[in-house]
From Swiss-Prot:
GO MF terms, alphabetically ordered: nucleotide binding; RNA binding; RNA-directed RNA polymerase activity
Ranges for domain RdRp catalytic: 281-467
One Pfam family it belongs to: Flu_PB1
Keyword Cytoplasm set for record: no
Protein name: RNA-directed RNA polymerase catalytic subunit
Signal peptide start-end: none
Species this protein is from: Infectious salmon anemia virus (isolate Atlantic salmon/Norway/810/9/99)
GO biological process, one term: viral RNA genome replication
Gene name in the database record: Segment-2
Key words, A-Z: Nucleotide-binding, Nucleotidyltransferase, RNA-directed RNA polymerase, Transferase, Viral RNA replication
Assembly mode: The RNA polymerase is composed of three subunits: PB1, PB2 and PA.
Enzyme class: transferase
Function comment: RNA-dependent RNA polymerase which is responsible for replication and transcription of virus segments. Binds the promoter sequence of the encapsidated viral RNA. Displays an endonuclease activity involved in cap-stealing. Cleaves cellular pre-mRNA to generate primers for viral transcription.
Amino acid sequence: METLVGGLLTGEDSLISMSNDVSCLYVYDGPMRVFSQNALMPTLQSVKRSDQFSKGKTKRFIIDLFGMKRMWDIGNKQLEDENLDETVGVADLGLVKYLINNKYDEAEKTSLRKSMEEAFEKSMNEEFVVLNKGKSANDIISDTNAMCKFCVKNWIVATGFRGRTMSDLIEHHFRCMQGKQEVKGYIWKHKYNERLKRKQLSKEEVKFDREEYTSRSFRLLSFLKNSERTKLEPRAVFTAGVPWRAFIFVLEQTMLVVNKLDPNSVIWMGSDAKINTTNSRIKEIGMKNQGQTLVTLTGDNSKYNESMCPEVMMVFLRELGIKGPMLEVLDYALWQFSQKSVKPVAPIKKRTGKSTVVIKADSVKECRDAFNEKELELIQGVEWMDDGFVRVRRGMLMGMANNAFTTASTIASSFSFTPEAVYTLQSSDDFVTGSCGRDVQHARQRLEMALKVSKAAGLNVSQKKSFYVEGTTFEFNSMFVRDGKVMANGGNFENMTVPGGLGPSTDLFVVGKQARNSMLRGNLSFSQAMEMCKIGITNVEKVYYGNRKYQELKNEIREKCGEETMSIPESMGGDRKPRPWELPQSFDGIALKEAVNRGHWKAAKYIKSCCSIEFDEEGDQSWDTSKTALVVIRKNETDMRRRTVKTRNPKDKIFNDAMNKAKRMYETVVDRNPLLGLKGKGGRLTVKDLKARKLIDEVEVVKKKKHV
């Protein structure tokens, strides 16, 4: 849905548009879409844009990196010869050099260089286990994606790495690239089994030479980015291998210090601090230029990821005086962006008549009949490699070095011939620019000059998605500021009120907390917050209260407490429905107080026994000290996940008996204390923990055995 900015924020009279009389802005009033298609076409779109924006404006150079001769397609342009309405993915390096020297004097360069050197040393001495963090990464041994910790493990096994720090990892990586270290690993392939008459997964050992290993270290895998607001078409995100991520980690940690010292960057701040800092600094511009008119520009940069230029950061490092191994490591991290190749994680499926055809990435060019004209145009418009990967020589691709490229953006985004007349705050591709002048037209001229100069660093402000208004009214980080006051933007009501599976009490409290924060941040009305709470209550009822176990729990409580169940909250199995205005508070505590005031002592005792406050005094028992069988408390009590094996020997029978005893133990505990079935209430407990918390008196204990 599109809403006129003039009517939404300040009125059409005060609106100044760059290209039209009225611009537009998306309002988050619909559910987030979850895409189930293949990532091939979104990947090719991103690759084609990266090549298209820099076509004809790059020149190939031979550079020296760690004693190795490498090729780099470096882009450069003359800004005065460019059409400013076009999106261009190269920078004016001569103008960038001037802007860097204009922004930092020699004393500031010296101070910044020392801070960067300290951050670089600290990041190089970090243990490599920091690369384990993350959901998914590229396993360069088999070109498949897996959890980050498994990718790191596979790389260590294949290359024989024995170091501890990031510096050791980078040094070992270069030994592998120079052929001084053997690289071998295992891959799984589907092979036809003659005896079984079907395909079967088989494990194969593979060895890589120097060229193959180097090529694989630059490979990226793509998949779809889901749950995006206002996005009708999916976008591709990319994941890299261990060596790539190691260099980017060092680069990002080093440039994080630059962003913290840069007054124009707010990427390192949290959501609340970011919007409050931006609001206060835009106000300062108006105060420093009293008597002048303030115009605020906000919006979006067109194709930010595909337009970013690594060579801008190379100029930045040299102008600061960075030298030696630090310069080589950071240069290599930036050079990687010119050598990357990508392919989707999963093969693409196409239906032809009554059958479904599975097309792998390396067979796309041979299966042209399965694609339409628009898809064929994308397939033919990119550079394919023999192994099904697509070469991408330009651009950043989504979210790989945000700290570094935010620094590149702030170099050129606040240019003005008059000091402190134009001020920009940048957070990746999101920005706010304030401009002051004698009148609206003068402020607009200064703003347009800043936009033209920002083209030098590869920034392309979108004329369709951007707008500027008079005064301190802008949008930043999905929050609106009107006349200096933050307007609460709940974003997507449906997404914010969906239960997270943490249990009814916790999910209700999360909804109430979000509604309360929206009221505190800005001018979200009380009735709107209550509407959000009502939606959350309805969704929790649909998810939890139709469960068979919940109904059994409710019947047991009615037998024990009788009419006093009207004082027990629904989230604990009672009949008391939560009121919307209770969600931002402790509604369980409110129910306990009401039960005491009414004299419903059975209900009060039950509510108190379900609360986790009184158990904090006991403390959690260590897993190491307890040798009893584990009682795993799960969100869904009906799904035990206790597997049994086919009985083939005496050990299997003992194993099955132990699993059955553990299952009975679990059911006994949950039947006596149903609230343990809610994640966050019971957690992950042993029998000893349950006894210490006085949840159970006696329960059958199954001792751990080695074969279990």
